Swiss-Prot record:
Residues that coordinate or bind GTP: 23-30, 71-75, 134-137
The organism's place on the tree of life at top rank: Eukaryota
Residues of the J domain: 217-273
GO molecular function: GTP binding; GTPase activity
Protein name per its UniProtKB record: DnaJ homolog subfamily C member 27-A
Pfam families: DnaJ (PF00226), Ras (PF00071)
Disulfide bond entries: none
Main location: nucleus
Family, per entry: Belongs to the small GTPase superfamily. Rab family.
Primary gene name: dnajc27-a
Length: 273
């Protein structure tokens, strides 16, 4: 006969979670799930019609986890179908195609859609997100580099992984870390532990790196107007250099941003008497 202690231990081990996939059509959401659950890759594209549902069992941290996976269609046509499935979610697999930048730029829109459907009582800060930079096997056509994807993800406290559903690269590692984080979430009363949210860099640093990445010229990069004086250029440079120096800034892409700022200053000072 089971004791109360044994029953409590068993109930602690058993866990049921809900996971959804999000991202544009054709980024490989279904292929990532099939690669992990069925150990296979389906080369021919088959559009998800509305929602695909599956159940799998995994063992994480000495716990049996029953995972209910809702693979959501990425086409806007299916919005009225997928909007019913956002609530009561513990984990989200957010996918983009590294070869098509528009799928990366759509990630903010997916988050906005989820926030809208969760309503004022919803809180995505208490959901585990795993961002998959997918199709890294197609490196010849890559338009979103790792530092850009990692910066976007980590600035929001999301997990980030480079994956290939075709080769399987990064898939198992992603799911293991993803499920482990969800177990921690559930054990912490449905809230992400503080240690999981600490990202190691500021919003100002992340915003500056993104701005520098998209600047068209050296004036814009330093944030000064054409015709600025030598002192104004140096002042703007010093501010950014302190903010982004790789020894002090842990944000992905900080080293490249710092080098770009140094080069911008050098280029401008050459033309200022």
């Amino acid at each position: 006969m089971e004791t109360n202690l044994q029953k409590r231990k068993d109930s602690r081990k058993a866990l049921r979670i809900k996971v959804i996939s999000m991202g544009n059509a054709e980024v490989g959401k279904s292929c990532i799930i099939k690669r992990y659950c069925e150990k296979r890759f389906v080369p021919k594209y088959q559009a998800t019609i509305g929602i695909d549902y599956g159940v799998t069992k995994v063992h994480i941290k000495d716990r049996e986890i029953k995972v209910n996976i809702f693979d959501m269609a990425g086409h806007p046509f299916f919005y009225e179908v997928r909007n019913e499935f956002y609530k009561d979610t513990q984990g989200v697999i957010l996918v983009y195609d590294v070869g098509h930048k528009e799928t990366f730029e759509s990630l903010d829109g997916w988050l906005a859609e989820m926030k809208q459907e969760l309503g004022p009582q919803g809180n995505i800060d208490n959901i585990v997100f795993a961002v998959c930079a997918n199709k890294i096997d197609s490196t010849k056509h890559r338009s979103v580099d790792e530092s850009e994807g990692r910066l976007w993800s980590e600035s929001k406290g999301f997990l980030y992984f480079e994956t290939s559903a075709q080769s399987g690269e990064g898939i198992n590692e992603m799911f293991q870390a993803f499920y482990s984080a969800i177990v921690d979430l559930c054990d912490n009363g449905g809230k992400r532990p503080v240690s999981a949210i600490n990202i190691g860099f500021t919003k100002e640093q992340a915003d500056s790196i993104r701005r520098i990445r998209n600047c068209k010229d050296s004036w814009d990069m330093l944030g000064v107007k054409p015709g600025a004086t030598r002192d104004e250029v140096n002042k703007a440079y010093r501010k950014l250099a302190v903010l982004l120096h790789p020894d002090k800034c842990m944000a992905p892409g900080s080293e490249d941003a710092f080098k770009a700022v140094v080069n911008a200053r050098t280029a401008l000072l050459k033309n200022i008497k």
